[in-house]
Amino acid sequence: MADQLTDDQIAEFKEAFSLFDKDGDGCITTKELGTVMRSLGQNPTEAELQDMINEVDADGNGTIDFPEFLNLMARKMKDTDSEEELKEAFRVFDKDQNGFISAAELRHVMTNLGEKLTDEEVDEMIREADVDGDGQINYEEFVKVMMAK
């Protein structure tokens, strides 16, 4: 499954993995998964976190290592009912729920994920996605960016 990913995708997932893997030991624990999900405004129970880990924990050691994480991401990318997931992700970014992601909202979420971005980097991300040039990202633009990944 993971062998269908491009080098770019793998590099991107490695970066995402290291955001989860707070102590850098090469494994994501339920605690680390919970921390990241809470920073994204989710509030999973301990049981839900354990279920998520069990779903991809191929070797049964109770944590997710990078190959297991890659398999999860490859499966999620094949998941065609991702419309709901995209809407959910958009809502996480669109803090004031006005239908647009502003530079401030983007910076806020990225900071919560542990990504310290300069104003220039945030503006660049907005510019890349901002098809109609209004300085913010609407849902259609968001979907385009997410599907291009």
From Swiss-Prot:
Keywords: Acetylation, Calcium, Metal-binding, Methylation, Repeat
Binding site for Ca(2+) 2: 57, 59, 61, 63, 68
Coiled coil spans: none
UniProt keyword annotation of Repeat present: yes
Top-rank taxon, per record: Eukaryota
Domain EF-hand, residue spans: 8-43, 44-79, 81-116, 117-149
A GO molecular-function descriptor: enzyme regulator activity
CC annotations in GO: cytoplasm
Matching Gene3D superfamilies: EF-hand
InterPro entries noted in UniProt: CALM/Myosin/TropC-like, EF-hand-dom_pair, EF_Hand_1_Ca_BS, EF_hand_dom
Amino-acid positions noted as binding Ca(2+) 3 in the UniProt annotation, renumbered to this chain: 94, 96, 98, 105
Residues found modified as N6,N6,N6-trimethyllysine: 116
SUPFAM superfamilies, per the entry: EF-hand
Modified sites of kind N-acetylalanine: 2
Binding, Ca(2+) 1: 21, 23, 25, 27, 32
Binding site for Ca(2+) 4: 130, 132, 134, 136, 141
Role: Calmodulin mediates the control of a large number of enzymes, ion channels and other proteins by Ca(2+). Among the enzymes to be stimulated by the calmodulin-Ca(2+) complex are a number of protein kinases and phosphatases.
Additional free-text comment from the UniProt record: This protein has four functional calcium-binding sites.
Family designation: Belongs to the calmodulin family.
Protein name per Swiss-Prot or TrEMBL: Calmodulin-2
Native source organism of the sequence: Glycine max (Soybean)
Name of the gene encoding the protein in the UniProt record: CAM-2
